[in-house]
């Protein structure tokens, strides 16, 4: 089992445990165990669909006898009235899986919709939009899947798959040179093939990084577009570049036109509205 599927399965199991507990007594009390039925996933708001594959896993994990017919795949732009899928099976199973499936699909579709909006804003540039670790605890893998579905790029998944030397790391380490050198030594000692990114707060710090080298990407933290253009010129293509901090949808393209490779946007995952949809008997 790969790590991604393992995390998703654990999330599904936890979600069912917190929702159903010792039983869905409403459903169990009024719906016969033998009753069969169908429900459709009805889209009620325009956006980008995401989470269909996870929904299929939710149904299968709860009741493998449920049959799912998909009409619209992940990444497709949808509109009110669209039917994304129809699920057939025991009515008890349909009712007990409804809320978890909707919670996941609404959240993922909201993120994919927001990401698509940002990605379209960057069309015609060489800049890609990145997500961050500002995610819902326990749901990061799903939220980062949604970013990719929407056309964005995943930054690191967690603290384990990339070294990102931020301001606090630099300050506690005693400076940029010490932070970078210790990171390189650590990777060598541990046999870790990890990319190293460092955050800079001003041109002095940027010059220190350029003089020392040893990194893969440089993040410009809270730079204005004018500062960003100068910083990109200083880097001169030697390292990947990323803009972060204080960037809004309205200023996104201003930063992209400075020539940065990536722009990281926490809003893709930390303050997204779910896409409206419902699961109705049919």
Locate predicted features.
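Glycine-rich beta-strand-to-loop/alpha-helix junction loops that act as flexible
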Residues: 220-221, 241-247, 265-267
């Amino acid at each position: 089992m790969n790590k991604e599927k393992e995390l998703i399965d654990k999330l599904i199991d936890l979600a069912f445990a917190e929702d159903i507990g010792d039983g869905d007594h409403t459903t169990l009390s009024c719906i016969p165990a033998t009753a069969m039925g169908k429900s459709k996933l009805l889209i009620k708001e325009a956006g980008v669909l995401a989470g269909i594959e996870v929904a299929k896993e939710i149904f299968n994990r709860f009741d493998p006898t449920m049959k799912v017919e998909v009409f619209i795949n992940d990444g497709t732009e949808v509109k009110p009235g669209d039917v994304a899928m129809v699920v057939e099976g025991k009515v008890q199973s349909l009712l007990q899986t409804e809320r978890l499936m909707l919670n996941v699909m609404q959240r993922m579709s909201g993120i994919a919709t927001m990401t698509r909006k940002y990605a379209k804003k960057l069309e015609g540039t060489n800049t890609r939009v990145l997500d961050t670790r500002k995610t819902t605890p326990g749901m990061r893998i799903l939220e980062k899947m949604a970013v990719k579905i929407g056309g964005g790029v995943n930054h690191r998944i967690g603290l384990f798959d990339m070294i990102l030397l931020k301001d606090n790391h630099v300050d506690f380490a005693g400076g940029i040179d010490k932070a970078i050198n210790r990171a390189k030594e650590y990777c060598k000692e541990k046999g870790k093939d990890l990319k190293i990114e460092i955050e800079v707060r001003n041109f002095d710090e940027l010059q220190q990084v350029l003089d020392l080298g040893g990194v893969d990407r440089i993040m410009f933290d809270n730079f204005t577009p004018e500062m960003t253009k100068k910083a990109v010129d200083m880097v001169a293509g030697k390292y990947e570049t990323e803009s972060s901090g204080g960037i809004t949808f309205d200023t996104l393209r201003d930063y992209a036109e400075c020539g940065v490779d990536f722009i990281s946007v926490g809003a893709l995952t930390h303050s997204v509205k779910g896409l409206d949809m419902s699961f109705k008997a049919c």
